[in-house]
UniProtKB/Swiss-Prot annotation:
Residue ranges the record marks as coiled coil: none
InterPro entries in alphabetical order: ARM-type_fold, COPS7/eIF3m, eIF3m, eIF3m_C_helix, PCI_dom, WH_DNA-bd_sf
Name of the gene encoding the protein in the UniProt record: Tango7
PCI domain ranges (all copies): 181-340
GO biological process, one term: sperm individualization
Species in which this protein is naturally found: Drosophila willistoni (Fruit fly)
Predominant cellular place of this UniProt entry's protein: cytoplasm
Function in brief: Component of the eukaryotic translation initiation factor 3 (eIF-3) complex, which is involved in protein synthesis of a specialized repertoire of mRNAs and, together with other initiation factors, stimulates binding of mRNA and methionyl-tRNAi to the 40S ribosome. The eIF-3 complex specifically targets and initiates translation of a subset of mRNAs involved in cell proliferation.
The protein's name in its UniProt record: Eukaryotic translation initiation factor 3 subunit M
Stated family: Belongs to the eIF-3 subunit M family.
Length: 387
């Protein structure tokens, strides 16, 4: 989201005077006279009534008024500006409709970018900015990912408690439109807990698991099991369900669902979507140990008909998690490679053996090339002696 620098070609006193007159004219309970307590008191009074312009003003006009308020606000020293900034942010969340919410969003973004990057107030502005972005469907304009979020606060990192609060908000505003991003936010949230306080993160851990399971583009779920708050859920149904998605096959999920239908539905999970994901995960697991699979075997493992095998495999290939070739003539699927669902000690050993084999092959090639080069050199020398 772009933002223009704040600059008003009037003195602070003149701006304050004009704003007071403007809001009084709109019917706000404010004096048109400047406060004798200074510009900060003026700002408190102006911000207290600034939402009166939301009633009848045009968006462009309101944007200009808010821009004037921001231009004064950023001149206030940090140690005296917190209450003023927080009061303004609260007012910006009160926009009565989407067009005005966009104006308020632009104003908050302008304030955010004009505050010093080392100012702790930027966190509070950004938090309210996300709230307003949700109101006008502009969340993707202000939050593009966790890396971008962290870079914005690099010069003044918020506390763990503040980031937890922000991550919860970001999860809430993205869960209906971008499950993948929402899932990453929840994983970051759980990563902020330590062994000492992970036990209090039960609700966050459950939300994280549900979001990851519901995301149609998240297939590698093994890392969730290592998160401390998730470990505290061992023995709970949600942890059992996660474990199935991490390492079990389709029949295990079907059995779990038959025994705990109410629980699965109560978490907001869609059974058919779960079946679709578990079929893909089951196929990945089968591909790890089978270079080829018959259509008949796949119908049994995936609980689909033979006519559904080809469309299913094509969908799997689109994810790029598995590389394979369909052999329609022989009713088989030939596997080239697959991503592992879990990556533990066996996978590390397999990787080590593969790298060792590559090393030995490269050594053999190098030795062969050295021998060829040596033979060519000897031949050249012998021919030189003959002549």
């Amino acid at each position: 989201m772009t933002s223009h620098p704040v600059f008003i070609d009037l003195s602070l006193d003149e701006q304050v005077q004009e704003l007071r007159k403007y809001f009084k004219k709109l019917g706000a309970e404010i004096s048109s006279e400047k406060s004798n307590k200074g510009v900060e008191d003026d700002l408190h009074k102006i911000i207290g009534v600034c939402d009166v312009c939301f009633k009848d003003g045009e968006p462009a006009q309101i944007d200009g008024i808010l821009n004037s308020i921001v231009s004064i606000m950023i001149t206030i020293p940090l140690d005296r500006g917190e209450n003023i900034v927080l009061a303004y942010c609260e007012k910006m969340t009160k926009a009565p409709n989407q067009p005005l919410a966009k104006v308020c969003l632009q104003s908050l973004w302008r304030l955010f970018n004009n505050l010093d990057t080392a100012s702790p107030l930027r966190y509070h502005v950004y938090y309210h900015l996300v709230q307003v972005a949700k109101q006008c469907d502009q969340v993707l304009e202000v939050f593009t990912g966790v890396d971008q979020l962290k870079s914005q606060f690099a010069n003044c990192p918020p506390s763990s408690e503040q980031m937890q609060k922000l991550y919860r908000l970001l999860h809430d505003v993205t869960k209906d439109t971008n499950l993948e991003r929402s899932s990453k936010v929840m994983i970051e949230l759980l990563g902020t807990y330590t062994a000492d306080n992970a036990c209090v993160a039960r609700e966050d851990a459950m939300k994280c698991i549900v979001t990851a399971l519901a995301d149609p583009n998240t297939f590698l779920l093994d890392p969730l099991l290592s998160l401390k708050p998730v470990r505290f859920l061992e023995g709970d149904l949600i942890h059992d369900l996660l474990s199935i998605f991490v390492s079990e096959k389709l029949p295990a999920y079907v059995e779990f669902y038959e025994e705990h239908k109410e629980f699965v539905n109560s978490q907001g999970l869609n059974h058919e979507q779960n079946m679709k994901k578990m079929r893909l995960l089951t196929f990945m697991q089968l591909a790890e140990s089978n270079a080829e699979m018959s259509f008949e075997a796949l119908t049994k493992e995936l609980q689909i008909t033979e006519n559904e095998v080809e469309p299913f495999v094509i969908e799997v290939l689109k994810t790029k998690l598995v590389r394979a070739r369909l052999d329609q003539a022989n009713r088989k699927v030939h596997i080239s490679s697959t991503m592992h669902r879990t990556f533990g000690a066996p996978q590390w050993e397999q990787l080590r053996d593969l790298l060792q084999a590559w090393k030995e092959n490269l050594s053999s090639v190098r030795e062969g090339l050295t021998n060829v080069a040596s033979a060519q050199l000897d031949l050249a020398r012998s021919q030189k002696l003959i002549h």
